[in-house]
């Protein structure tokens, strides 16, 4: 976008175009990445690859999805310093190149792993953090809904690309199917053109003069404070003079009467410190000792406020991750704070369920009726038919991403995350009992809805707890937690399945436990008030019964 289009206020409609760009990038990237397991059977029987084992093929899934968060740390560091458009263009080029190199040059499965899968991993990292950071910069009130739109792309891609890939691999083989999938990289070109980070609108001189005149009319010579500036204490003396003079003026005013100075802190009862005139001169009727103690207390409060506000620029003041661009060492130390650890652990545990499902869904469903397995007596479900179940999964991912994102705007992101993780954990457990196409479709709808909701709310949790000039780094660092789940889960699940006579029951149990445990971590570390927005609004509302 041109600079004139990016200088807009928060929650501007143009922000939805930026959210749409993130949706399109995820449609392309996750739609292609999630199709990899569909080709496992064809690769396993391909003599040009040397008939690789299922475990060796699953390593490609680990690299493409599991290593992506590791590269996401570097991408998150870069997105704070480079335009998101540059990162998205790089993502599109890498994915397109990987598809064509692997489909034309691969002589064994490891060439596929370290060309297509590795390029796809880096490409996914280059689009995820930039898209989320760019979208979050445009929204304040509707950030949950915007993030829901941004992260709905994975569901749309899963609904469109894997079913087509399933038909192509049956008709043409995995090599030709890879080349046909590269057509979807054109979507990344459009998404790159739409992405941009919001910048604050320029303030012309006339508007600044009008604001100054309004401030002078507000009383006591104090200027109206802008919403993005720190609160100041005192009147003209505090605003115009140096540190020491400002402090002495305000302290002297406090010791004399404590009636005309506004402070930046207000007690819970809603009354300011110096509100004697507004409340009938509460100081009357007190003896000299009580009046002296009251004035001293007021002066002490002013001292605290002045020390906090006037000395904000001194070197000894603690630097905040919300207001300062942190050094690498400070970024490392901030990773041990509760907000970061809570987000990191939520994603770390959730990734086991997510990547296990992406890897195991189609092989599990297509194993129905397969000889030599525990499902030999079940009516068979062919691979191309099993791949169509991703349509149900993808459609409900879209619904879940948008609906849960909207729900998070009404209540809290923590409530939405805990709810989706709990229901999704139950659905993953029931998946072990599925034996028919209809049962799998119903369960994948529920799981897709919940996983997409968690995926959409996660960036909102990160932006809420770790907002500031380092947000891009924190996006990448939190998503780094997915390395363990994404890299380890597919091979581990393949090994467990082979050692249990082809049974995927333990795979479903691992997914269920991961989802449920993720809900517990969010509840314990991130959900501070333990109340939803609707409950808080209901408690503040006083209903009067009219007889």
Swiss-Prot record:
Its record classes its membrane topology as: Multi-pass membrane protein
Report the InterPro entries cross-referenced here.
MFS (IPR011701), MFS_Riboflavin_Transporter (IPR052983), MFS_trans_sf (IPR036259)
Tell me the compartments it is located in. Answer: Cell membrane
Record gene name: RibJ
Main localisation, per the record?
Answer: membrane
Cite the GO molecular-function annotations of the record: riboflavin transmembrane transporter activity
Transmembrane as a keyword of this entry, yes or no, is yes
Q: Which GO terms describe its biological process?
A: post-transcriptional regulation of gene expression; riboflavin transport
- Which residue intervals are topologically Cytoplasmic? 1-11, 80-85, 130-144, 197-344, 408-412, 459-470, 527-547
Write the record's keywords in alphabetical order, separated by commas.
Cell membrane, Glycoprotein, Membrane, Transmembrane, Transmembrane helix, Transport
State which ranges are Extracellular (membrane side).
Answer: 33-58, 107-108, 166-175, 366-386, 434-437, 492-505
Q: Give the domain of life.
A: Eukaryota
Q: Which Pfam families match?
A: MFS_1
The chain's coiled-coil residues are none
A single cellular component GO annotation:
plasma membrane
Q: Where do the segments described as Disordered lie?
A: 198-293
Could you tell me what this protein does? Answer: Transporter involved in riboflavin (vitamin B2) uptake. Also transports FMN and FAD.
Where do glycans attach?
Answer: 501
**Residue spans with biased composition (Basic and acidic residues)?**
244-255
Naturally occurring in which organism (per UniProt): Trypanosoma brucei brucei (strain 927/4 GUTat10.1)
**Membrane-spanning residues where?**
12-32, 59-79, 86-106, 109-129, 145-165, 176-196, 345-365, 387-407, 413-433, 438-458, 471-491, 506-526
Q: In its UniProt entry, what is this protein called?
A: Riboflavin transporter RibJ
The UniProt entry's sequence similarity note says: Belongs to the major facilitator superfamily. RibJ family.
